[in-house]
């Protein structure tokens, strides 16, 4: 983890605690959006601790298509409230989504940023490590991937995890071979754009 390329920190608090989170953070951060600004973005507001950017989310994600968004919010509400998994970070127990929802969420997050801004290899590694170390509820995963209409992107990314990063096919649910040409197009874009498009902005 010490060698992992850093990103920002996403903290999900939900709608009910959104304003309370802003109040609680004011005294411990170096920068924070004003109270009158926290609803400017439909998903989150921003704070900083030194140079580290923190996004405090009332919604984990918002889909552009209303029907898909309504469906996603139902899955997210369940995934962020039931069977939560505690992870200890620097002596603090942090609750993370259920393993079942997290499988989808890690993929959803990287796919969203791949389409909108760019990702680094670290996001692919995150998903590969998670799949390698967790038992995946394939019935639930198939339901959510199919319902959210992202089974093909899942399989495309999955083929890269297997063929480029060495994830076992047995650990990659719904693995199907994908053409090397398609894989190379995606890898080339990842390497050119970099983490959240940083490489393309630099060059």
Where do the protein language model's features map onto the residues?
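Conserved NTP-donor binding/palm subdomain of two-metal-ion nucleotidyltransferases/polymerases, i.e.
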Residues: 1-7, 13-203
